């Protein structure tokens, strides 16, 4: 795990934060789409 975070251009925290942000945006868009109808 540590070798992967240190070897790539992305850090372990930044890649995890990016996934979390995309997941949150997906939830927001999904709730807005369902709420629209």
Curated annotation (Swiss-Prot):
It is found in: Membrane. It comes from the Bacteria. Belongs to the SscA family. This is Uncharacterized membrane protein YczN. The chain crosses the membrane at residues 16-36. The keyword Cytoplasm does not apply. The keyword Transmembrane applies. It is a single-pass membrane protein. GO terms for cellular component: membrane. Keywords: Membrane, Transmembrane, Transmembrane helix.
């Amino acid at each position: 795990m540590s070798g992967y975070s240190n070897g790539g251009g992305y850090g372990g925290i930044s890649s995890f934060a990016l996934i979390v942000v995309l997941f949150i945006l997906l939830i927001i868009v999904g709730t807005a789409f369902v709420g629209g109808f």
